[in-house]
Amino acid sequence: MSSRKVHFVSLGCPKNRVDSEVMLGVARAAGFAHVDDAAEAEVIVVNTCGFIGEAKKESIDAIFEMAQHKEHGSCKRLVVAGCLSQRHPEELAREMPEVDHFLGSSDMLKLGRVLAGDAERMLVGNPAEWLIQAGDPRTLSTPGGSAYVKIAEGCNRTCSFCVIPDLRGAQRSRPIPDVVREVEQLAAAGVREINLISQDTIAYGRDAAGRSEGGARATLAQLVERVADVPGVRWVRLFYLYPETMTDDLVELLAGHPRVVPYVDMPLQHAADAMLRRMRRGHGGDRLRRVVSTLRERVPDLTFRTAFIVGHPGETDAEFEELCDFVRWAEFERVGVFRYSDEEASRSYELEGKVPARTAASRYRRLMTLQRRISHKKSAAMIGRELEVLVEGTSDEHEYVLMGRHAGQAPEIDGQVYLSGGEVRPGEMCRVRITQASDYDLVGELLDDEESGRGAGLPPAADLGAVTAKRRVALRVLQTDGRERQQN
């Protein structure tokens, strides 16, 4: 084992996690071993989130926490990367003399120069300079048999509240063959679930980078079908869809392809026409109702996850009530609610009618309470059903209880299925009968091979402990709500 050690802290979204995994791969290729304890590390890397005020604060707190190890630990070099340094490079460099190097949101591969000892302090480049490729080094940090795959970078939208285009640049789609090569590598290592992510997944292929050599435009449906056909892949899941163009062929894949899970992650942000105009979303509430109705009608057993913003400038009591009515009507399985963050670089920063923080907090609580009742009803309806579950590992609370997820539960955000009644390994797919339910989590009993029909169509599970021991590490992940998880 290498005597040179590195520790990573990753903040924010799954897209940032992939960037952290690339830097982990760069570090490993440079001869560094990853350690869970920051006090043991010669180099510490903090991959930051700079999307909203709360995320910026958590990133800054994490940086200062890690800086303590330069005084009291083994740390000789502290590196700050990601969206926060992309957004505020000069300010951070001035206010944080403890930091030795700054990398931006597209500078992951530059970590190699830092580790080699011949890099300048400021390495923040153009956010549109980099797009991940299958050949880039990467060390997985996700649990069990699951991995995220970035299919594009950047965004061309102009939503009022969002600064992502400034942080990540314009949309750049990966060619289908390159994405497929990466998925093939992951499947060969035992990964069963492929989670396709980008800033604007529905827009995949519309930019020049996504076109084939012949000039034909790649489509998201074409990509999804190719990924789902990779041997060893059991689930393909889509994140960050936009309610603009859900093509028939994409809906058909969600409805009928045996390896494309009937799961839609589509942040709708609001439902009132006036609010959607202020947010510059490009559609009204009627469009959203049509999209939801179409997906419910055409995709059997659909799980619909969405997100809303409350407290955006100009939001009235009546518009908030319209949003609540919409949520009651739609009965989404999963909803994330965010209080508006007034970011100076956003278009909404200049809008009048700022909503008091107390009002926004009250609306947040009301909408979450409403959705919690809906989610509990949806979870209770799962009792008695038999589901396919991807086993991820042992429960944090009970070492003798396994946990996993069914197709309607995305990694980290949608709850777990807690398992009893048998022995299975992380990365294995098994059949489970649900016996209990809470608002978000389920409890189930493993069915034996004969009862579940296991083995009739499911490939044998890879031993992830053996196959990916050299590629998978524990990554300290700080989510933007302040929760910390140790992912194995």
Swiss-Prot record:
Biological process per Gene Ontology, one example term: tRNA modification
Limits of the TRAM domain: 380-448
Known cofactor(s): [4Fe-4S] cluster
InterPro entries: Elp3/MiaA/NifB-like_rSAM, Methylthiotransferase, Methylthiotransferase_CS, Methylthiotransferase_N, Methylthiotransferase_N_sf, NA-bd_OB-fold, Ribosomal_uS12_MeSTrfase_RimO, rSAM
The protein's Enzyme Commission number: 2.8.4.4
Coiled-coil ranges from the UniProt annotation: none
Annotated binding of [4Fe-4S] cluster 1, by residue: 13, 49, 83
Catalytically driven reaction(s): L-aspartate(89)-[ribosomal protein uS12]-hydrogen + (sulfur carrier)-SH + AH2 + 2 S-adenosyl-L-methionine = 3-methylsulfanyl-L-aspartate(89)-[ribosomal protein uS12]-hydrogen + (sulfur carrier)-H + 5'-deoxyadenosine + L-methionine + A + S-adenosyl-L-homocysteine + 2 H(+)
Keyword set includes Iron: yes
Keywords: 4Fe-4S, Cytoplasm, Iron, Iron-sulfur, Metal-binding, S-adenosyl-L-methionine, Transferase
Sequence ranges assigned to domain Radical SAM core in this UniProt record: 141-377
Gene3D superfamilies documented for this protein: Methylthiotransferase, N-terminal domain, Nucleic acid-binding proteins, tm_1862 like domain
Protein family according to the UniProt entry: Belongs to the methylthiotransferase family. RimO subfamily.
Protein name per Swiss-Prot or TrEMBL: Ribosomal protein uS12 methylthiotransferase RimO
Gene: rimO
